[in-house]
Amino acid sequence: MAKNVRVRYAPSPTGHLHIGGARTALFNYLFARHYGGKMVVRIEDTDIERNVEGGEESQLENLKWLGIDYDESIDKDGGYGPYRQTERLDIYRKYVNELLEQGHAYKCFCTPEELEREREEQRAAGIAAPQYSGKCRHLTPEQVAELEAQGKPYTIRLKVPEGKTYEVDDLVRGKVTFESKDIGDWVIVKANGIPTYNFAVVIDDHLMEISHVFRGEEHLSNTPKQLMVYEYFGWEPPQFAHMTLIVNEQRKKLSKRDESIIQFVSQYKELGYLPEAMFNFFALLGWSPEGEEEIFTKDELIRIFDVARLSKSPSMFDTKKLTWMNNQYIKKLDLDRLVELALPHLVKAGRLPADMSDEQRQWARDLIALYQEQMSYGAEIVSLSELFFKEEVEYEDEARQVLAEEQVPDVLSAFLANVRELEPFTADEIKAAIKAVQKSTGQKGKKLFMPIRAAVTGQTHGPELPFAIQLLGKQKVIERLERALHEKF
């Protein structure tokens, strides 16, 4: 990279951090860190009616949770602030006045009703993409002064140059061209005095010395408008990279109303997903490393990130893959951290009290350890461990079939006799008791283990049996064995 790399992620506080925004932030971050550059988080809060309370804090908090430790923002001044657009209105005003003075922009007094009428007339004439006619472009200074004196509200529009081709040399899509004739004179300042996105973003990116802009492909159509502003001021635009859409499993564009996918980072956090797994997963949404490996640490991703490997085709948000990936991380997780992740869900579900005794806390820790291999996310411990919290065992159909086999009464009777004598009631002692049953009954393998598992858990698959039996407790195991011996299957 010839110049200093400075990138930006510019969320609006109109909601919480969405998976699309998280992916954009992540690619900006990986690129900046790969080249030893800086990442700016700028808050684009000019759509005041749509801003939600706590939206700003939520965006920043979730970025930090993911491991995106940006360099500059509203909470980290890097000398390029303010980092909130509503605090930059005077800056925009200065540049708007410059364009007005140079004749590159003009005041437009057309009412919303007039503009709608224009659009309808153009549609009726078969024009698919209506544009502003530009009639206020030709007002004389006297006419403008008179309309202003009458207190008529106005917007400010940019004069679109005629007969120009705008070319974007995009890092993802290659060369993309736009014709100025397809773009009508567009509004740079709304009637309320607030600049529009396509104007403010150019001023900000230039003054903050942004070198590269990674953003979603829905912004591609904004690029020619932004290039016009760069051109009028004689500024060099940044290098653009428009990332492909994220689609759902039906290959449809992800919409915030799509209920088949959890869409906000905070929801994954609440469910007990790990930030390092989410970071890894988002990095593979529209970018692929060389080779087959899919599990990478943050530092590895920073080292191998290569813009040339950004995908040109839509990337599918595969929830099964995310769950699989999170499970890979959980398997390797330090038990203390896993307990921190999963235990609150058992409390929230009412399975355990909030103020646990040391004994209860140790039992919960052992329970969570028992399911470490199977658990895909923290909250899943509640459904996985259900059998430990039921008074009565519930038999699955497969368990009933196992318990109907002819050798079962012998196996269960022998095991029950051993369990009654067991002291201490530990996994090692339980393992020895199962071995003793093997000896006395001659049954082994599935014929031995399956009936015991089915009788005490109601299931045919599950965590390591001696440990599960230990955690169920001696009394509960005796009751369940007795019931299985008396019940008809």
From Swiss-Prot:
Catalyzes the attachment of glutamate to tRNA(Glu) in a two-step reaction: glutamate is first activated by ATP to form Glu-AMP and then transferred to the acceptor end of tRNA(Glu). This is Glutamate--tRNA ligase. It comes from Geobacillus thermodenitrificans (strain NG80-2). Binds 1 zinc ion per subunit. Belongs to the class-I aminoacyl-tRNA synthetase family. Glutamate--tRNA ligase type 1 subfamily. A motif ('HIGH' region) lies at residues 11-21. The keyword Transcription does not apply. It is found in: Cytoplasm. Monomer. The gene is gltX. ATP binds at K256. A motif ('KMSKS' region) lies at residues 253-257. One of its GO terms (molecular function) is glutamate-tRNA ligase activity. Zn(2+) binds at C108, C110, C136, H138. Keywords: Aminoacyl-tRNA synthetase, ATP-binding, Cytoplasm, Ligase, Metal-binding, Nucleotide-binding, Protein biosynthesis, Zinc. Its cofactor is Zn(2+).
